[in-house]
Design a protein with these regions (language model features):
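C-terminal helical subdomain
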Residues: 137, 141-144, 149, 157-197
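Conserved glycine-rich Rossmann-like NAD(P)H-binding loop of the short-chain dehydrogenase/reductase
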Residues: 1-12
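Substrate-binding pocket helix/loop in short-chain dehydrogenase/reductase
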Residues: 58-62, 66-71
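Conserved NAD(P)H cofactor-binding loop of Rossmann-fold oxidoreductase domains
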Residues: 50-58
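The beta1-alpha1 cofactor-binding region of Rossmann-like NAD(H)/NADP(H)-dependent oxidoreductases
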Residues: 6-8, 23-35, 67
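Active-site helix of classical SDR
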Residues: 85, 119
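Residue(s) in the substrate-gating loop at a strand-loop-helix junction
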Residues: 103
């Protein structure tokens, strides 16, 4: 089961994949989150929280950050992933994995990245605490690294980001968490890829 805000893009992404249920919607909507968990039949083996929002573009310094926009960033980047985990916990199979996608901005103090970065730091801490509280499950915070995405372009308006790697280069790192037996914790996709090469 997969979701995205853009139903058309979601349908294109799912394509002809067998057994994949597309549930379009916004993870900041509690009703949509409930529909997502209900659409997952039986036990849940994997939950990947990848939905994210950058915030204003260009990103302002924290002294000028619009607080309503910061609340929106936290609602999508922090509250929604935790809410999905809360709904999924009773149905997570023993040994199930939860991957929360974070960022290097969660651990590095980049100028103007305070809103997004602090939300990803909060998500990483929530992931660590969930791992400590649920010994039979694996909770991973995954930093995919810089990628050539729309969000990256929004973060650097007017700049050429063609030198960033495409998102698919981070996939082996994600697969290492999903298929491996690593302890709960914070991981960087590039390091996981290098370790498995």
């Amino acid at each position: 089961m997969v979701d995205a805000r853009d139903g058309n893009a979601l349908d294109r992404a799912v394509g002809d994949l067998d057994g994949v249920v597309a549930v379009p919607g916004d993870v900041s909507d509690p009703d949509h989150r409930r529909r997502l968990i209900e659409a997952a039949a039986g036990w849940i083996d994997l939950l990947v929280n990848n939905a994210s929002v950058l915030g204003p573009s260009p990103q302002p310094v924290l002294a000028d950050y619009p607080l309503e926009e910061l609340r929106r960033v936290y609602e999508i980047n922090v509250v929604a992933p935790l809410a999905l985990v809360q709904l999924a916990l009773p149905r997570l199979a023993d040994g199930a994995r939860v991957v929360n996608v974070t960022s290097d901005a969660a651990v590095e103090a980049y100028e103007t990245w305070g809103g997004y970065g602090s939300s990803k730091a909060a998500l990483a801490q929530i992931t660590a605490v969930l791992g400590a509280e649920n010994a039979g499950l694996r909770f991973y915070a995954l930093d995919p690294g810089d990628m050539r995405t729309q969000m990256q372009q929004e973060a650097f308006p007017g700049e050429d980001i063609s030198d960033r790697p495409p998102p698919e280069e981070s996939v082996p790192g994600l697969l290492a968490l999903i298929e491996g037996n690593l302890a709960s914790g914070l991981y960087r996709a590039r390091e996981l890829v290098e370790a498995t090469a």
